[in-house]
Amino acid sequence: MKRGRKMRQKKEKQKQSKKKKTHIPFRLNVLFFIVFLLFSAIIIQLGKVQIIDGETYRNEVNKKEDVTVSTPVPRGKMFDREGKVIVNNKPLRTVTYTKMKGVDSKEVLIVARNLAKLIEMPQEDMDKLTETDKKDFWMQLNEKRAATKVTKEDESKFRKQEIEGKDLDKKVEELRRERITQEELNELSKEDIEVLAIKSKMNAGYKMTPQIVKKDVSQNEYAVVSEGLSSLPGVDTTVDWEREYPNDKILRSVLGSVSTENEGLPREQLDYYLVRDYNRNDRIGKSYIEKQYEDVLHGTKEQSKNITDKAGNIIRTEKVTKGKSGNNLMLTVDMDLQKKVEESLERNLRAFHSSEPMMDRAFVVMMNPKNGQILSLAGKKIVNKDGGMQIEDYALGTMISSYELGSTVKGATVLAGYQTEAIKPYTHFFDAPMYFKGSSKPKKSWKDFGDIDDLRALQVSSNVYMFNTALKIAGIDYVPNNPLDIRQETFNKMRYYFRQFGLGVPTGIDLPNESIGQMGRTDNIPGFLLDYAIGQYDTYTPLQLAQYMSTIANGGYRMKPQIVQEIREQPNRPEEVGKVMQSMEPVVLNRVDMDLSYINHVKEGFRRVFQEVDGTGAGTFKGLPYKPAGKTGTAETVYGGESDIGRDENNYRKKCYNLTLAGYAPYDADPEVAFSVVVPWVNNDKSGINSAIGKEVLDAYFDLKTQRSGASPVPVAQ
């Protein structure tokens, strides 16, 4: 039985072995068939590539597409509120160079030499070349002679100092440069220097970015270069731009400035601009309006793609996206008014300069109290240059410099008294010198007025009334020769109300670097509260003073000052101002925490200042047809400038006055203009320069209004 079982098992194994043998050849055949199909497909595809698509692929092998080249476009323009151009773009015929990838210094030199035959470089560009520039150029022109400047022994010394690789190359290069003599540099001809100036411009920027070689080329140069572009790889002729100011220096400091292509992007903001598709050498707004509205003014660059061969030669250029000039800004400023305001400032500074040597600046702000639009933002400053007196634009001083403003802030003091219930309308105090324990000098008005109420106090500018109001806010009744016990909380309380008018806080103007003024000493000295109440403690800017007066003029709404009125598209015709893209709506920053009847009561006091016989401003403003109201101011201070003329023999700052003025018109209807005048560091507090300037600028505003009553509007694109 065992033997039979073994025989059966042997037969089974033989059957299974036969089955396996029959399966293996079948699988091999399938595999060979698949391989055959794959090879057939590859052969067919190769045939297609060689026979059908061969020419196409040969062309693709011989060329490559480089990165997109961006070409800058003109910035947006700026117009005044009447549609007159303030900032324009002057077109300039320009020669540029775009360095392609793979182009070496020898190829650049060839192009520079060919270009030097066609254009003449400005002397200033050649004067900017450094000795290092010239030595490097000499080495490029005299490679064999330059190589002999450093011996193998020199290199061996460096290696002994364990200097190898790139560091060794750098040391060798520096030593070669150092050993070039002045005689060898003198071998460079005038033509060589001109070639070097061109080459330096060509190498100044970044690859694939057009670099300006020469701007404002002559018509002949532009023509001959354009004709020879085929033999000048990388060179192009185009029309560039530079900022142009039809009104010269008027408002220039506020308009801001634009960087040059050499300055390019600021290092501290490089990443910010690069992620926004700027090139490193792009021109951008550096300051104020140009900087604040960079995103609006910059525009969209034209982008094109250069198709090149293996050698880097451009076969053709394909435009990817069409460029678009920046959008335009319509400012709130009235340029005709601005000119007249600046003329007034300059005229008065010149007239008073001989008798007022410390008085070197003056400011005016005019704004619409209903919407916050700035109508004029003007400042002038006397500087000594080249041994003579010059007057420069200092409009920025209206928002970045601050001064004690004197009695112009008394309206805020009275209103703070009302709101804290320290006083009421028509509250009376007796105006006479006030004496306090520990003080040798009395606190008094410029004149003793006797029994007066709040309106009379504003009209004649009583200091004593304001002192009593401040004491009442502090919870103190005046007793002669008593000590003052005023806590810091009273300062905080008064500042709370002053700040509601914009005094001591940002005005919110759409420009950077605004000053909020300076607080007086923070230690708790009671007498300083009295100084604060008459504007002789904290400092404020001329713009803050104008916002304060606007807030009173419009019934208690603090409006955000705006210098840009609209953003407009580029028009199709130059005489148009473009369609409105965005209008800047008026912004109410806050409503003052004061009863409207209180504000109107103070406005009556301001009317009396300008219109009643013994008002401090009546001598200048009484009876004028445009019915102005406001407040004069005189602050005792010390010289705050840098000139030695403001210091005595012991180097102490001399005492002087800040003369100020603020107001609005008309007083008997909705006021349409509010203004401030600040003239710091005056010797003679009776000079009246503040009132003279104030009248001149108000006259100018209403004269222009009359002249324009029948004028035709500026055309707007449809």
Language-model region placement:
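Short, gly/Ser/Thr-rich active-site loops of penicillin-recognizing serine hydrolases
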Residues: 575, 692-718
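Solvent-exposed, polar/charged alpha-helical surfaces in well-ordered, non-transmembrane soluble domains
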Residues: 106-113, 117, 223, 227, ...
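A short acidic/glycine-rich loop-to-helix N-cap element
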Residues: 681-691
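Beta-lactam-recognizing serine transpeptidase/beta-lactamase-like catalytic domain environment
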Residues: 87-88, 93, 307-322, 333, ...
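Conserved, well-ordered alpha-helix/loop/beta-strand core segments that scaffold catalytic motifs
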Residues: 210, 313-355, 362
